[in-house]
């Protein structure tokens, strides 16, 4: 297998979808086999490769083609102000990318905002949806037990509005259960991504002012989703409440949940080995 790194797997596609006309999407494309599309979260500086770099190798070695798009308005993809809820627009961007690449059907892995995109994709394009793997997905409305928005979401919006290294540290301290793993390399890498395109930050805020988070809620339609689904959650998630996982398995047609202890909002990173074993087994046998 050729060397697996960000630069060697990097490419761009141009899509034409509603709200995304002549729009460039950056992605990383690695491996061969059944397609798995990994959708990243919505924090400032997020991107496909950085969100999943602890998972790409094991998936490729297991015989999957892994595609990691940067969502519209993130990392190397074009910037955008959205007039519709972000999960739906992101789902359209995935469909557009698949069209350009000639991919008819794919499994979807989605973390946080990426989970919201995966849910919307399954609702809009069920015939093109394989299995779903969701980690603390957004887009599920209020919580029965937790005041919303949660602490992490408040810090996320603070970082978008007033980007600083100190606010980034505060957000990462909430983002991860074990704060000792927040290395200077992780911090500086994320900070560099944030600074690379200030328009992304400004346009995220403008989009949120036009379409609030409450508009993302697809709870009423969960029963329509037929795709086999693995839901994972960090017991200590301070961005999206744990009871949303119960909402998913109570309403979706074929879903089960796995909760990681000593884990916050980034299960695929904090518990990478266990996550990789669990999800690869689900794709092969679930």
Swiss-Prot record:
> Where is the signal peptide, in residue numbers?
none
Pathway(s) = Xenobiotic degradation; biphenyl degradation; 2-hydroxy-2,4-pentadienoate and benzoate from biphenyl: step 4/4
GO molecular function per UniProt: 2,6-dioxo-6-phenylhexa-3-enoate hydrolase activity; 2-hydroxy-6-oxonona-2,4-dienedioate hydrolase activity
Q: Which reaction does it catalyse?
A: 2,6-dioxo-6-phenylhexa-3-enoate + H2O = 2-oxopent-4-enoate + benzoate + H(+)
Q: Which UniProt keywords apply?
A: Aromatic hydrocarbons catabolism, Hydrolase
Q: Note the HAMAP family from the entry.
A: Biphenyl_BphD
Record-listed substrate binding positions:
42-43, 51, 111, 180, 190, 266
| E.C. number(s) listed in UniProt | 3.7.1.8
* Entry's Gene Ontology cellular component terms: membrane
How does this protein assemble?
Homodimer.
Per the entry, what this protein does is: Catalyzes an unusual C-C bond hydrolysis of 2-hydroxy-6-oxo-6-phenylhexa-2,4-dienoic acid (HOPDA) to produce benzoic acid and 2-hydroxy-2,4-pentadienoic acid (HPD).
Q: Where is the active site?
A: 265
- From the UniProt record, report the name of the gene that encodes this protein: bphD
* SUPFAM superfamilies in alphabetical order: alpha/beta-Hydrolases
Its recorded name reads 2-hydroxy-6-oxo-6-phenylhexa-2,4-dienoate hydrolase
One GO process term, biological-process aspect: biphenyl catabolic process
Residues marked Transition state stabilizer (site): 112
Q: Which InterPro entries match?
A: AB_hydrolase_1, AB_hydrolase_fold, AB_hydrolase_sf, Epox_hydrolase-like, HOPD_hydrolase_BphD
């Amino acid at each position: 297998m050729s060397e697996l790194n960000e630069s060697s797997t990097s490419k761009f596609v141009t899509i034409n979808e509603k709200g995304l006309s002549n729009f460039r999407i950056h992605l990383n494309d690695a491996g061969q086999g059944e397609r798995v599309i990994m959708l990243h979260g919505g924090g400032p500086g997020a991107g496909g490769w950085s969100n999943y770099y602890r998972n790409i190798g094991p998936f490729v070695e297991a015989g999957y083609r892994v595609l990691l798009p940067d969502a519209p308005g993130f990392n190397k993809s074009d910037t955008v102000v959205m007039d519709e809820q972000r999960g739906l627009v992101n789902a359209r961007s995935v469909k557009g990318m698949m069209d350009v690449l000639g991919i008819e059907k794919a499994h979807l892995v989605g973390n946080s905002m990426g989970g919201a995109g995966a849910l919307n994709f399954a609702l809009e394009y069920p015939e093109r949806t394989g299995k779903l793997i969701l980690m603390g997905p957004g887009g599920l409305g209020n919580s029965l037990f937790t005041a919303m928005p949660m602490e992490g979401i408040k810090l996320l919006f603070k970082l978008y509005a007033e980007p600083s290294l100190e606010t980034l540290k505060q957000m990462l301290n909430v983002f991860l259960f074990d704060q000792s793993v927040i290395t200077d390399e992780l911090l500086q890498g994320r900070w560099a991504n944030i600074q690379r395109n200030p328009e992304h930050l400004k346009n995220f805020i403008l989009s949120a002012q036009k379409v609030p988070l409450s508009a993302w809620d697809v709870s009423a339609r969960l029963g329509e989703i037929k795709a086999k689904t693995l839901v994972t959650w960090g017991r200590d998630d301070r961005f999206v409440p744990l009871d949303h996982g119960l909402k998913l398995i109570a309403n979706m047609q074929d879903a089960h949940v796995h909760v990681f202890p000593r884990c916050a909002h980034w299960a695929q990173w904090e518990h990478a080995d266990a996550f990789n074993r669990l999800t690869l087994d689900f794709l092969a046998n679930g």
